[in-house]
Amino acid sequence: MDIEYLEEESDISICEKVEIISDQESVEESIEMDTTSSMFYDSFISDTSVSDSYNQDTLNYYRLRGEKFMIGDYWPNQKHMTPSMRSILVHWIFETFDAYDFPTEAFFHSVKLFDLYLEKNCVEKNQLQLISIVTLLIASKFDNRRNILTSEISYISHNAYKMEEVIMKEREVLEYFNFDISFPTAIHFLHHFANGTFCDKYTYMLSCYILEMSMLGYELVSVKDSIKAAASLLMALKIKQLEWTELHINVSGYEEADLTITMWKLNAVIKNKSINRYCSAIKEKYKKRINLNIFESEDFPKNTMTKEND
C-alpha cells in the first residue's frame, strides 16, 4: 500500500471520520488537557507552587532517561523513504491525534517511537504507514485514558491494512523495544523549562508551535530533546525580542551559544516550503482562540528569523 494518497484531499477528513465514529459508539469524553493549550498553561506552566527542587529533579531524571533513547542518523539505512514521505506520515499522526483531542505528549511519543524503530530497522515503502499506525496505537494507549481502537484505525487510514496485520506488527514493535517505551520527549522538557523560567503564555504557545512544526523535519531527529525544547523557547524569545537570561541558563542547563545552531535549524524547518505543504493541521490548531490565535496574529509573518548575513 502506497502512502501517496495521504497527500491528496479525501472525500472525508480525519476529523469527520472521528465524528462519525463518535456518533456510532458511546465514546467516553477524554479528561486529558492538551498540554499545548492556554488552559494547560494556566493550570501548570504558570503554577508558582511547583518547587524549584522538584522541577530540577524531574529535569535531571528526564536527561538521564533520555540518554537511553537517543536517535542516530538513520537516513542512509532507509532506502525506501524520502523526507517528504516522513513529513506526510508525521503530519498524519498529528492530524489523527488532534482529531481525537488526545494530549500532545501522545504525538511526540508516537513520532519518537517511529524514528527509534526506523533507526535500526530498514522498512519497505509499503510498510512505512503500518509502522506509523502501530506507533500511533501504542502511544494512544500509553498517553491517554481512552486509546484508539484497531477497528477505528482501519477506517481512518482508508483500510490500508487488515486488523490482523496491525495487531501482529504492534506486537513485533513492542517486542523490539522489549516493552520499554517510557521516555521523555521534547515537549516534556519544554513544560519544565517554561515553568521554571516563568514563561509568559504567548511565548509558551509560540514555543509549542515551533516545537510541533519541527517534528515534520528530519533535520532535528538526532538532536537531543532537551536541546530542541530549549532552542524552541529561545527562538520564541528572540521573536518576541526577549533575552535568554541567567534564569534560563540555570533551569535548562544551556547557554545561548549551546542552542544557536539548533535554533536556526528550527527556523529553517518552519520556513521550508516542502514541509509547509504538509502542516495544515498544525496551522489550524494554532488558529484557534484557545491557542491564542498564534497562527493568525498580525505579527505571525515575523515569526521566523533571518540571519544578518543572509
Predicted regions and their residues:
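Acidic, serine/threonine-rich low-complexity regulatory regions at protein termini
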Residues: 1-133, 137-310
